[in-house]
Regions:
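HhH-family (HhH-GPD) DNA N-glycosylase catalytic core used in base-excision repair
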Residues: 1-240
Length: 240
């Protein structure tokens, strides 16, 4: 019914050229104030907040790294795994009021995952999986009860790289630009992704077959944009 078209007239190249003009003299990074926390601390904060990044903006209310400084126990796996009160404290801070029946088990089970498989350290996940992006994503998304969808896992791994916490050894090119209201909106408005009828990103933000298809195509078209941008950057580097 939607008759999707991916990059029908070379729009990805046009978008890549715009991105290059904006960022060739600027650093691309996640804009988060980590308050000089250690890499271990940054990882545990982002691990537990990434799980809850579902229909809420975890940075909208306050800086979660600041919350960590005041309430470090909310991010200690051994304490979290058996303590509903600590989970409630973090969820209240994040403003995660909806779907508590899912959010609390995610926290408890993901804490148990860290205790049982990663020596209670989210930071060690990268080391234990030898810096392999695919293996880390597989481990985090192996069971739904951990709370990591594919989207959340890729977002978490991207942030760990951008914040200088983890360095990957294999399959870094497999990291996706994940679908959200921003990437979908830009894809639709620039025409890198086109449909037979006009669509609104907000309309698509529901769990249905059409959304799954658009999500997949959105990731695909942004990967093409990345590839075009990479070619432009390579040419620029060669000229220098």
């Amino acid at each position: 019914m939607l008759s999707p078209k991916v990059n029908p007239n070379g729009e990805c190249l046009a978008v890549a050229k715009v991105l290059e003009s904006i960022y060739k003299s600027n650093t691309i990074k996640v804009q988060l104030d980590t308050l000089d926390l250690t890499k271990e601390e940054i990882t545990k904060v982002r691990f537990f907040t990434a799980i809850q990044d579902f229909n809420i903006d975890v940075h909208a209310r306050s800086n979660p790294f600041e919350f960590y400084k005041r309430h470090p126990d909310c991010f200690k796996p051994k304490k979290v795994k058996d303590n509903d009160l600590l989970v409630d404290e973090l969820l209240n801070f994040l403003g995660a009021q909806s779907q508590r029946d899912k959010r609390k088990p995610w926290m408890l089970n993901s804490a148990k995952l860290l205790v049982e498989k990663y020596d209670s350290s989210a930071y060690k996940i990268n080391e234990i999986h030898n810096g392999d992006v695919i293996e880390i994503v597989k481990a985090l998304t192996a069971e739904e009860r951990y709370g990591f969808s594919n989207k959340k896992a890729h977002m978490f791994l991207r942030d760990m790289a951008d914040l200088g916490v983890w360095k990957y050894k294999r399959n870094i090119e497999k990291l996706d630009v994940m679908s959200d209201k921003n990437t979908m909106r830009v894809a639709l408005r620039t025409g890198i992704l086109q449909f037979r009828i006009p669509l609104l990103a907000s309309f698509l933000d529901v769990f249905c077959y059409q959304y799954s298809m658009v999500d997949r195509l959105n990731r695909e078209v942004w990967r093409r944009g990345w590839e075009e941008w990479g070619k432009i950057m390579s040419i620029r580097s060669w000229k220098i």
